[in-house]
Amino acid sequence: MIDFYYAPTPNGWKVAIMLEELELEYTTHLMRLGDGDQFKSAFMAISPNAKMPAIIDHDPPKSYGTNSVSVFESGAIMLYLADKFKRFIPTDPLGRKEAMEWMFWQVGNQGPMAGQLSHFVNYAPKDQQDYGHKRYGGEYERN
């Protein structure tokens, strides 16, 4: 069984899709970011950077020992699950390398650029949106 700490964000959606595609049993814990749920000590013990998403796997691979395992960051969670269930990740070295390149590109480039663009579109004062659109829109479209 997996506890899934989730907020309806692109990073949360990625992990939710992975859990569904693996047809796993999991319990969703909705984190109310506006209420500061991510800063509560119980959650910080799971995700020390106070970011979504995170999981606790109560039945980890034997190589992890007998205790439950927590994993935070969407890419780390997806890789952990892919490795555990031997699905959605190539096992040959070249295929795995290529999958890692695309995963790291998404979590380190495309995802953050989309997040910054969304921030400027949704929250920047109208007179400051042009810079955000030019900077992050251009990077996002380039990706």
Residue ranges and their predicted role:
Residues 1-132:
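GST-like domain detector, emphasizing the conserved glutathione-binding G-site
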Residues 132-143:
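Amphipathic alpha-helical packing segments from all-alpha helical-bundle domains
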